[in-house]
Design a protein with these regions (language model features):
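Conformationally flexible catalytic loops at phosphate/diphosphate-handling active centers
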Residues: 2-98
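Short acidic, glycine/serine/threonine-rich loops at helix termini
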Residues: 13-20, 119-121, 145-147, 170-174, ...
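A general structural motif
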Residues: 77-93, 110-117, 137-145
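Glycine-/acidic-rich phosphate or pyrophosphate-binding loops and their flanking alpha/beta elements
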Residues: 83-106, 119, 239-251
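Peripheral docking tails and interdomain loops at the edges
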Residues: 158-248
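Conserved phosphate/anionic-ligand binding catalytic regions in large, soluble enzymes, centered on
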Residues: 255-264
Length: 265
């Protein structure tokens, strides 16, 4: 099974324009006989089965490791089906998608809805002579480190990884640790990596927050761990944000804010 979304409550309640697939197109992507075979394995009182009732310690460890080949093969399978979708619908899905300057020196790695905000900021900064970019994570688990390395321009010197979670007591959040490990295993020790948190509890992450991240990457002495979108006056991890930052919205855009309470929303 796949979890096919990375965002929370606020995003799920937005009104967005979407492109809906025709089911006939979807059938072409799937082996429906395999789907039926998979569904037939589900627990059903009409043909009951017992599974996972007990397993001794002498074989449990071996059993857990035996699934490794399935996880190792999965990125290539996902990549194959993404290619089919791209061919059919004209999209550009990949395990990791890069957006920005081909010769970027500063890059953000993130996933989910913050990428849309980051793209607006990238367009503005690159149009004004800077060289920045974004790596969008499409497949988080299983993580494909070699594909991440391919997506990062060779010119990159500094990376900020943004996680929408907090792991108290850990040296970094999950995506940050994956990126650091992938770069270390690939011998890319020339890249400096910092990690930040954003959007907890559906906290807004406006363009000013993304501007702040790229500004932090300019510094010689960067905060290794930081937050954006809030003012942290306790542990002082938050980055300073310019509330009068440039307007990155498309020309002619009208922005409105509606206030409601409870069921009014």
């Amino acid at each position: 099974p796949f979890v096919n979304f990375f965002d929370g409550f606020r995003t799920s309640h937005e009104i967005q324009k979407i492109e809906k697939w025709d089911y006939e197109d979807l059938k072409e992507m799937c082996n429906m006989e395999a789907v039926e075979e998979f569904r037939a394995k589900a627990l059903n009182p009409e043909h009951p089965k017992m599974r996972g009732s007990h397993e001794n310690g002498d074989v449990f460890f071996q059993h857990r490791e035996a699934c490794n080949p399935a996880y190792e093969a999965l990125p290539a399978v996902v990549e194959k089906y993404m290619a089919k979708i791209n061919e059919k619908l004209g999209t550009n899905y990949d395990l990791f998608n890069y957006y920005g300057a081909e010769d970027a020196d500063r890059v953000i790695v993130a996933m989910g809805s913050i990428c849309d905000v980051a793209e607006e900021v990238i367009d503005y900064l690159n149009a004004h002579g800077e060289k920045v970019g974004l790596v969008k994570v499409r497949l988080f688990r299983p993580f494909a480190p070699e594909k991440l390395i391919e997506a990062i321009p060779a010119s990159v010197k500094k990376i900020a990884v943004l996680d929408r979670t907090k792991e108290p007591g850990a040296l970094g959040e999950p995506l940050y640790q994956d990126v650091v490990t992938a770069l270390a295993n690939a011998g890319r020790n020339d890249i400096q990596v910092i990690g930040g948190r954003y959007g907890l509890g559906s906290k807004d992450t406006p363009p000013a927050s993304v501007f702040a991240v790229y500004d932090e990457l300019k510094r010689d002495e960067m905060k290794r761990q930081f937050t954006i979108g809030i003012v942290d006056d306790v542990t002082n991890l938050s980055l300073p944000e310019d509330k009068n930052c440039p307007n990155t919205a498309a020309p002619g855009t009208i922005e409105c804010k509606f206030w409601g309470l409870g069921g009014d929303g």
